[in-house]
């Protein structure tokens, strides 16, 4: 619902507000720029401003602008609003107009917040604003005030230079503005989990460098196509960042690895994969690696085996989904729109041995894997490059 005359969007952040004033200022500027980039990417007209504690959008299309802002990392919520003078008369007039346009009976409430210096407080806004709503609709309805469980709430936010009247909050992803953390290499397999892990890392402010290992006979065109589709979707959330997919030509190395290993094969494969990611990260200036692993989801993802594969790299391995159930991961994939293109079994399942070890000693893994495994990883990383991902 849009209030009559809506011309603005009030954009709120969360964790940014608990930072020191210097850090908050920097993060708010980044958030402002990211919201502006999201609007431009979607063809939504508007000017984006930063005020302390808020980002404001001035737009002739406030509904579309609010939707774009609500898809921006770091945004907790966005509300299409009408901007008025910060005085009780102007606020009351805007509330009365909103009530005449949208109140259709039942209980209502006025919920006001105020920041800055005024000759009234939020209780005054609630009282005077409630009277204005009541007077606007009492001839046609029998209005009821219910502050605990209203059918419709009229929101007011008063700031130093203006006030905003609005009716809805459009939830955003929260987190931190993208670009406020160092980038991470995100291993993207084409399965359900890895795009969600990459998205969660982006939600906490870290741009990702997507890395896909082309597995040769153990993958295939459909396998790579799912990874490309996932990256296209992730790119929609980062219009002012480069999410070019890096493809590592690992097929020959995987063939040699499969021929040389037995029950520890998947652990050696993951160690090889981490080492490729480490070299790519070093070249790209990334601070770590992101994977979609969750404890116990597969034999290679037991707590013991995760420790074994971690020892293949000196970089931190971030696992945003570490404690998530599969149902939660699947729900998140549906929510961010990566589920459809990543819901089929991925090629690396065909690489797994029949009876994989669930708690392999590191000595056994090292003894079983080829001595040149990490040299293969270095060579594969050297041949890794960005590829063009076609727009669907």
Curated annotation (Swiss-Prot):
Reactions this protein catalyses: [ThiI sulfur-carrier protein]-S-sulfanyl-L-cysteine + a uridine in tRNA + 2 reduced [2Fe-2S]-[ferredoxin] + ATP + H(+) = [ThiI sulfur-carrier protein]-L-cysteine + a 4-thiouridine in tRNA + 2 oxidized [2Fe-2S]-[ferredoxin] + AMP + diphosphate; [ThiS sulfur-carrier protein]-C-terminal Gly-Gly-AMP + S-sulfanyl-L-cysteinyl-[cysteine desulfurase] + AH2 = [ThiS sulfur-carrier protein]-C-terminal-Gly-aminoethanethioate + L-cysteinyl-[cysteine desulfurase] + A + AMP + 2 H(+)
Gene Ontology CC terms: cytosol
GO BP terms: thiamine biosynthetic process; thiamine diphosphate biosynthetic process; thiazole biosynthetic process; tRNA 4-thiouridine biosynthesis
Domain annotation THUMP: ranges: 63-169
Entries under InterPro entries matching the protein: Rossmann-like_a/b/a_fold, ThiI_AANH, ThiI_fer, THUMP_dom, THUMP_ThiI, tRNA_STrfase, tRNA_sulfurtransferase_ThiI
Subcellular location, record wording: Cytoplasm
MF terms in GO: ATP binding; CCA tRNA nucleotidyltransferase activity; tRNA binding; tRNA-uracil-4 sulfurtransferase activity
Gene3D superfamilies: 3.30.2130.30, HUPs
Source taxon at top rank: Archaea
Pathway involvement of the protein, from the record: Cofactor biosynthesis; thiamine diphosphate biosynthesis
Pfam families: ThiI (PF02568), ThiI_fer (PF22025), THUMP (PF02926)
Function per UniProt: Catalyzes the ATP-dependent transfer of a sulfur to tRNA to produce 4-thiouridine in position 8 of tRNAs, which functions as a near-UV photosensor. Also catalyzes the transfer of sulfur to the sulfur carrier protein ThiS, forming ThiS-thiocarboxylate. This is a step in the synthesis of thiazole, in the thiamine biosynthesis pathway. The sulfur is donated as persulfide by IscS.
Family annotation (PANTHER family): TRNA SULFURTRANSFERASE
Recorded family membership: Belongs to the ThiI family.
Protein name, per record: Probable tRNA sulfurtransferase
Species this chain originates from: Halobacterium salinarum (strain ATCC 700922 / JCM 11081 / NRC-1)
Taxonomic placement: Archaea, Methanobacteriati, Methanobacteriota, Stenosarchaea group, Halobacteria
Designated gene of the protein: thiI
